[in-house]
Amino acid sequence: MSKVAKKPEKETLVLGLDPGTNVMGYAIIAVRGSRPTLIQYGVIHLGKYGDHALKLKKIFERVLSLVEEYKPDHVALEAPFYGKNVQSMLKLGRAQGVAMSAALYREVPITEYAPKKVKQSVTGNGNASKEQVAKMLMQVFNIKEQPKLLDA
């Protein structure tokens, strides 16, 4: 009886985005089977750009450069949440739209995830704090030092 060689599992690269109008977090994760590996993470600082239109331009440029550099198979984006400040929600929606446009410009599929679903998946608690999410991700990806900004 001959043995059939097992096909190696395909690696999938995912660009995760946490859009914001002052700070935008991102991470590049390679997934093989059910095992994720952190490739890169960071934040895009937008506070130094006073004009909202310029912030949107920078979001587009940076997300596009991440897509072109890492060539992700997929983009995971935090879906909008509902807040009381309409102006803030409008600005956040624009930031999310621009990030989506940059990925779609290179034909990378996008999936939006509700913040509570992300927290539930990472920590087991949909109401977890950013600190709790960061702590769990540090354990999963063996990150020694907690990032200064928890949007990363």
Describe the function of each predicted region.
Residues M1-A152:
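Phosphate- and other anionic-substrate recognition elements at nucleic-acid/protein interfaces
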